């Protein structure tokens, strides 16, 4: 599947989230109606070909060509003992631009279809990781090119709280591959 994603350029993992009338939610062990179904209608857009999947795609490509997997070797990780495995998590400008532009295009489409304004929320961990800092910076650049769409940004930690507390406030959410 990962090879198909890359080969067919399926870079946007589109995950709609919609509540329907009569479907109860299990909260504190009890099924009940928590949110108004017509108020929760969002779409998560996750980058689908970079990040943690990139090294796996590279290894699959090498195997298909009959080439030997040449892992990047780091002799030690200060502070970690014993066996350690790791995967690089590259995030590119090109990959970020295309998935973020996709999110803005989807928000604009939903705005026309639903007749209500839509927002795009960027979710990342840009306070910690360099790849997410690039992703967030590109989101800010593209936001400025789309003044007709409201924007917000959050670290993944805070976003999980928003998702549970106020799901009706979310429309289109764009995330790097890790989340």
PLM regions with names:
Residues 42, 119-120, 171-173:
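Beta-sheet entry/capping signal
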Residues 1-75, 81, 85-89, 178:
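N-terminal glycine-rich phosphate/adenylate-binding segment common to multiple enzyme folds
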Residues 58-60, 135-137, 166-167:
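Short, glycine/charged-enriched secondary-structure capping and boundary segments
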Residues 1, 142-143, 148-179:
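Glycine-rich phosphate-binding loop
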Residues 7-8, 33-38, 113-114, 143-144, ...:
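Solvent-exposed alpha-helices and their adjacent loops that cap or buttress functional pockets
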Residues 65-157:
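Glycine-rich phosphate/diphosphate-binding loop of Rossmann-like nucleotide-binding domains
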Residues 52, 129-131, 160-162:
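Flexible loop/turn segments at secondary-structure boundaries
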